Amino acid sequence: MEGSDFLLAGVLFLFAAVAAVPLASRLGIGAVLGYLLAGIAIGPWGLGFISDVDEILHFSELGVVFLMFIIGLELNPSKLWQLRRSIFGVGAAQVLLSAALLAGLLMLTDFAWQAAVVGGIGLAMSSTAMALQLMREKGMNRSESGQLGFSVLLFQDLAVIPALALVPLLAGSADEHFDWMKIGMKVLAFVGMLIGGRYLLRPVFRFIAASGVREVFTAATLLLVLGSALFMDALGLSMALGTFIAGVLLAESEYRHELETAIDPFKGLLLGLFFISVGMSLNLGVLYTHLLWVVISVVVLVAVKILVLYLLARLYGVRSSERMQFAGVLSQGGEFAFVLFSTASSQRLFQGDQMALLLVTVTLSMMTTPLLMKLVDKWLSRQFNGPEEEDEKPWVNDDKPQVIVVGFGRFGQVIGRLLMANKMRITVLERDISAVNLMRKYGYKVYYGDATQVDLLRSAGAEAAESIVITCNEPEDTMKLVEICQQHFPHLHILARARGRVEAHELLQAGVTQFSRETFSSALELGRKTLVTLGMHPHQAQRAQLHFRRLDMRMLRELIPMHADTVQISRAREARRELEEIFQREMQQERRQLDGWDEFE
C-alpha cells in the first residue's frame, strides 16, 4: 500500500468509526458491532473504498497486542500463578472439547479429516479482542466469570504455536525430523527475553523517567510493546503473548499506572481498527451463494461453544448467575482463525470455497456476540431484578426511590447502609452480577444493569428520585453518567466518588460540587488521630483537620485551569506555607482557650 493510499485508508477508517460507532451506541447495539458494520460498509464487499484487507488486518492486530500489554500490567506474577489451574485446566478442556466436536461436525460435510481437524481447532478459539472488550464493558473484569474467561483466552494464545506446527504434519509436508537446533535457539531466546525483562526493564524505565520528558516515556513504552511483539513474531510465537509477558514483568513496578496511561489511547484506536478490518474481511459473495450453509454453521458454532463453556463453568463451580455471561462472551470464533486457515490454505488442506466459508462463519459469529450478550443481560435482568422472594424483607417498600446509588462495591455499600439505616428509599444499580446475587441474598434491593443506559435509569426511578450517588470504579463511567444525568435528569442532585485529584478536577469542571475523594477523608481522620497521639489537644486537632480540608478544597478549585506541573508545584508550596501560618495563629490564640475535650471520636 502506497503512502497516499495508506493516508486515504486512515481517513476512511476514522470517518467510518466517527459515523458508525455513535450511531451504534445510540441504537443500543454497542461500539464493537458498530465497528464491524463500519468495516462492512467501506470494505471490498460494501462501497469498495478499501480492497487490501489482508495487509490492514495484519497491521490492526496491534490493537490486540496493546490490549494484552495492559492486561499484563494488571496481573502480577503471583496472581498469574494462582490462575494456573483455570488456565491449564478449563482452558485446555475448552480448546480440546470444542475442537473435537467441531471437527467431527465438519467431517460430516465434505471436509477431509485433515481439513476438519484444522477447522475445528481454528473455530474453537475465541476472539481475544472481542471478549476482553465486552468483559470490560460488562464489568466482568473482577468477577469469577471474567477471571475464568481471561484464563481460557490466555491458554488459547499459548495453543497458537502447537496448532500452527500441526498444519504441515497434517498436510504431509513436514520434514522427517525436527530441526532441534533451531527449536533450541528459539527456546533460549525466549528465556533470554524473560530474564532480561525481569532485571533490565525497571532500571531502564527509571533512567528514562528521570529525564522528566513525558514524550520520551511514551516513546519508550511504545518501543517496549512493539519491540516485544516483533521479537515474538520473529520466534514464530504469538505477538500478543509477548506483550502480555512484558506487561506482567512490569505489573509490580512503580511505573505501572504511567505505562497504562501512555498506551491506552493507542490501544483504543487500534482495537477499533481491528474490528473494522474484521468487518471488511466479510465475503458477502460467499454469504449470498451459501446463505443456508453459513447461517447453520454460525448457529452450530455458537451453540457448541456455549454448551462446552457452560458445562465447564458448572464443573469449575462458577455461580449459576455468571455461567451464561462466561459462555456467551467466549462463544465466537477468533482472529487466530484467519492466521491458521491461511496457513492451512497455503499447504492445500482446503478445497474449493471451504476456507472462505469458514472465515465468513468466524466473522459472522463475532458479530453475534454483542447481540448475544444483550440477550444475556435481559435474561439476567429478569432473573435478578424481579420481585423479592416472599420470605425476604425488602429494604424499600416504595417504588419511587429518593436516592439512586450506582455501584455497590466497598465504597457504595457504606453509603447504601447509612441511607437505609436512616429509612431512606434507595435503589441500587450494579453491573457485577455476582455482587447483585450476593447482596440480594442479604435483603438489599440491588438491580443488575449498566447505569449509563438512559432507559435503565428511567426504569430505576431517576425521574422521581431526588439524588443520585455515583460510586463507579472507572472514572470514565462516572463522567459519562454525570453527563447523562445533567442532560436527561437535570433535577437530580449529583453526588460522586472521585478516585483522586484528577477526577476531582474533572467533576468540578462538569459542575459537580458534591463529591468525595475516596481516601481523603479517611486519611484526614487518621492524621487527626496522629496529632492527638503526639500531644495535641483533641479540639485543636479537629480544627487543624477542618482548616486543612477547607484549604485543600480551595486549592483544588484554583488549580482547575492550571495544567502545567510547575504551576501546580508552585501553588502547592504556597498553600503549604499558608497552612503553616494558619496553624501557628491557631496555636497562639487557643493555647489557653481549650474547650476541655478529653477525646474526639
Swiss-Prot record:
Keywords, alphabetical: Antiport, Cell inner membrane, Cell membrane, Ion transport, Membrane, Potassium, Potassium transport, Transmembrane, Transmembrane helix, Transport
Compartments in which it is found: Cell inner membrane
GO biological process: proton transmembrane transport
A GO cellular component annotation in the UniProt record: plasma membrane
PROSITE patterns: RCK_N
InterPro entries with a match to the protein in the record: Cation/H_exchanger_TM (IPR006153), K/H_exchanger (IPR004771), K_H_efflux_KefB (IPR020884), Na+/solute_symporter_sf (IPR038770), NAD(P)-bd_dom_sf (IPR036291), RCK_N (IPR003148)
Positions of the RCK N-terminal domain: 400-519
GO molecular function: glutathione-regulated potassium exporter activity
Main location: membrane
Lineage top rank: taxon: Bacteria
Residue ranges crossing the lipid bilayer per the database entry: 4-24, 29-49, 55-75, 87-107, 115-135, 152-172, 177-197, 207-227, 230-250, 268-288, 291-311, 324-344, 356-376
Pfam family, one: Na_H_Exchanger
Membrane topology of this protein: Multi-pass membrane protein
Role this protein plays: Pore-forming subunit of a potassium efflux system that confers protection against electrophiles. Catalyzes K(+)/H(+) antiport.
NCBIfam families, A to Z: 2a37, PRK03659.1
Family the UniProt entry places it in: Belongs to the monovalent cation:proton antiporter 2 (CPA2) transporter (TC 2.A.37) family. KefB subfamily.
Oligomer and partners: Interacts with the regulatory subunit KefG.
Protein's recorded name: Glutathione-regulated potassium-efflux system protein KefB
Source species: Escherichia coli (strain 55989 / EAEC)
Taxonomic placement: Bacteria, Pseudomonadati, Pseudomonadota, Gammaproteobacteria, Enterobacterales
Originating gene: kefB
